[in-house]
Amino acid sequence: MTDLTSLTLAEARDGLARKSFTALELTDAHLAAMERARVLNAYVLETPERAREMARQADGRIAKSEGGPLNGLPLGVKDLFATEGTRTTACSRILGDFKPPYESTVTSQLWRDGAVMLGKLNNDEFAMGSSNETSCFGPVINPWRRQGSDVRLVPGGSSGGSASAVAAGICLGATATDTGGSIRQPAAFTGTVGLKPTYGRCSRWGTVAFASSLDQAGPIARTVRDAAILLRSMAGHDPKDTTSVDRAVPDYEAAVGRSVKGMKIGLPREYRLDGMPAEIEKLWSQGADWLKAAGAELVEVSLPHTKYALPAYYIVAPAEASSNLARYDGVRYGARADGSNIVEMYENTRAKGFGAEVRRRIMIGTYVLSAGYYDAYYLRAQKVRTLIKKDFEDCYEAGVDAILTPATPSAAFGIGEKTDSDPIEMYLNDIFTVTANMAGLPGIAVPAGRDAQGLPLGLQLIGRPFDEEAVISLGEVIEQAAGRFTPEVWW
């Protein structure tokens, strides 16, 4: 029998339909692979008993020719999504052993469609990070290594566990979230596909909040087709989320293989940065050539406020985080540190419960919202955000269908390489991705090549609002030209 963990999600779905193997066999293969790959630290909680029970139920549905589009397919869940009765911590000490009494909308829709939960995946604490090094469970290790080196690399963040697990073949796909690039950047670092939908396309209800006006759930998968299949189940209107958009969910998989002839692709001149590595520049040109060969038209465009996106993001996001994280006080749930009075208890709980990066962002956020600084920082950042959004609107009104950019300014770096230096060095990893969040647009990262050391590099496509289908079709063109990227097993 084929190694079941090497299948794409679409191949596994088709194999189950043909009864080439059972959902239980597929799940057991992934559970065994998870055991072998524990050194990667991708999972913070494995749920084998629940997974096998869900797989048996899926097999029962298959026997009756019933079941949803994800029936029997084993997935990993980022530890930011509430899973009823199953520990959910956002990878922070402050949530302790918290077991939610409810299920997030996104995961409930996956289970509705028959998916199997393998466990909870590691992420940066409260999704604050670009390398998955801020988790209270320790860093995630990228399954990729530089040629001839055994230096352990980061998988990107904050959805590092999701990306690492998909790349290593220890789940068929994974849920993730993207606030400033947390789906697309780790996908680029691990040779996987990361799809951030339009803001409001997937419900945020039951997902631990970082920055509410920026957070958006989406999938990380091995192929563009797999990401499209997962997004169809994850998306949809939810009356419990006031930012959820009541709009029909299309069949995203139907966009895979659709002709891109005549589509107009913008190449933003502002993304050509000083000091950009030549291999990133070359990859970008190669991606443009692939799209042109498929019949797309290339045009240079201008997004003049791009240079302000990163500083504006690092004002807006911490400001919202400082408000969202005020609820963690040790009173009703999560970890609690004792104090001689209630104020001291609050202070001790938050000081011991939050990690250094989360504390840093809470302090930045509290500062920019404080009297005397609100207008100078937060209000100005929101005005910049409006201008960034208008830049994209102007491009799309001029007939551009999607914008092609690099996904990251470099390949994956070593664990500890950037955490010990200036935190701004780490923040610069989001330079190509934050604009899509600030404007609420859909974006996809697709593996497109390798650097000189054999590490995967990705390209990003940013689409019109609610036109995920365009970036799926275009992303699949790049995928077909570049081929699949799979790391050699060393673990």
From Swiss-Prot:
<dbReference type="InterPro" id="IPR004412">
    <property type="entry name" value="GatA"/>
</dbReference>
<keyword id="KW-0547">Nucleotide-binding</keyword>
<dbReference type="InterPro" id="IPR023631">
    <property type="entry name" value="Amidase_dom"/>
</dbReference>
<dbReference type="Pfam" id="PF01425">
    <property type="entry name" value="Amidase"/>
</dbReference>
<dbReference type="InterPro" id="IPR000120">
    <property type="entry name" value="Amidase"/>
</dbReference>
<keyword id="KW-0067">ATP-binding</keyword>
<keyword id="KW-0436">Ligase</keyword>
<dbReference type="GO" id="GO:0006412">
    <property type="term" value="P:translation"/>
</dbReference>
<feature type="active site" description="Charge relay system">
    <location>
        <position position="78"/>
    </location>
</feature>
<dbReference type="InterPro" id="IPR036928">
    <property type="entry name" value="AS_sf"/>
</dbReference>
<dbReference type="GO" id="GO:0030956">
    <property type="term" value="C:glutamyl-tRNA(Gln) amidotransferase complex"/>
</dbReference>
<protein>
    <recommendedName>
        <fullName>Glutamyl-tRNA(Gln) amidotransferase subunit A</fullName>
        <ecNumber>6.3.5.7</ecNumber>
    </recommendedName>
</protein>
<comment type="similarity">
    <text>Belongs to the amidase family. GatA subfamily.</text>
</comment>
<dbReference type="GO" id="GO:0050567">
    <property type="term" value="F:glutaminyl-tRNA synthase (glutamine-hydrolyzing) activity"/>
</dbReference>
<dbReference type="GO" id="GO:0005524">
    <property type="term" value="F:ATP binding"/>
</dbReference>
<dbReference type="InterPro" id="IPR020556">
    <property type="entry name" value="Amidase_CS"/>
</dbReference>
<comment type="function">
    <text>Allows the formation of correctly charged Gln-tRNA(Gln) through the transamidation of misacylated Glu-tRNA(Gln) in organisms which lack glutaminyl-tRNA synthetase. The reaction takes place in the presence of glutamine and ATP through an activated gamma-phospho-Glu-tRNA(Gln).</text>
</comment>
<feature type="active site" description="Charge relay system">
    <location>
        <position position="158"/>
    </location>
</feature>
<feature type="active site" description="Acyl-ester intermediate">
    <location>
        <position position="182"/>
    </location>
</feature>
<keyword id="KW-0648">Protein biosynthesis</keyword>
<comment type="subunit">
    <text>Heterotrimer of A, B and C subunits.</text>
</comment>
